[in-house]
Amino acid sequence: MKFVSLLTFLLIPGCCLAITCDELQSPTQVRVFLERSKDSNPILRRNVSTTLEISPCEKEACNSKNRKEQQKEVLHLLRLDDNSRVHFLKGSRSSQCLIQRGERLLGCAACSELANEACRSYPDSSITRLQGTNIDSRDFSLLESESNTYSCDELEKNPGFFKLEIGISGAEYDQVIAFFDETREIPVTLNFFTDGILRKVYRTFPKYYLQIDKQWISTVLRVRSTRGNEKAFVAETLVYIQRDGNKYNLYLDPKNDPRLKNMSPSNLFITN
């Protein structure tokens, strides 16, 4: 009976397993892990359909008591492989959408759950950044450059977490210090430095991690652009996965999203 229990433990994918620095000894191992860890971020997953609340602000406006309601936008995000669609449902850009098809980014002035109209191309430089925020997918691409250097350290005072230091050359940032949850493979913080000065922090919160089909997802993300200290920030974006009661509007298989029940997800990347 003990043998059967042990065999079951070993065969169930992701059952109680944790990644440690022992499995991150080579640059290839680290890059594979970093690519896999992006699945914990609903904005970066290659396949997802979700409704998000995004609240960006700058400087003094971030401290306003009514900041969340004043700045909040609600959007539906659909990602299929290299294509993505951001449909703004509430806020200053309501009914607009941004569509990325491979290396091409289009902005559409009139969108619905079924169609995109009045679309035009955006410059290539806009393609990696979620407009109106400080969230940039290029930040995450930098982590996996083949020219990077990596070092991993276990945290004796914080068991269950490890620190990954990444040296970057020829980019806006030259160093990233990241802290990861070993079991969930989620980055708790990603700290981006230039010449030793902290410039940006991506932070998740373990209290708001969610497990779906053995995949852990961060349901809350905070991104701060900084001047040397996370508390001394000049811009901030808060991201929440929206909920209906206790159910998160998050579908790892877009076909299961009730919002898309009348439309094949792939058709939502068609523009007129």
Locate predicted features.
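A short, sequence-level motif marking secondary-structure junctions
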Residues: 77-82, 101-104, 124-130, 182-183, ...
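N-terminal signal peptide c-region/cleavage motif recognized by signal peptidases
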Residues: 13-16
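Gly/Pro-enriched, hydrophobic low-complexity segments
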Residues: 157-255
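Short, surface-exposed beta-strand/loop "edge" segments at domain boundaries and coil↔beta transitions
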Residues: 58-64, 92-99, 109-120, 171-175, ...
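Sec-dependent signal peptide recognition
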Residues: 1-9
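N-terminal mature ectodomain segment of secretory-pathway/periplasmic proteins
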Residues: 19-113, 148, 154, 239
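Flexible, processing/modification-adjacent segments and terminal tails
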Residues: 19-33, 100-176, 197, 254, ...
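Extended low-complexity acidic/polar segments
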Residues: 91, 248-252, 264
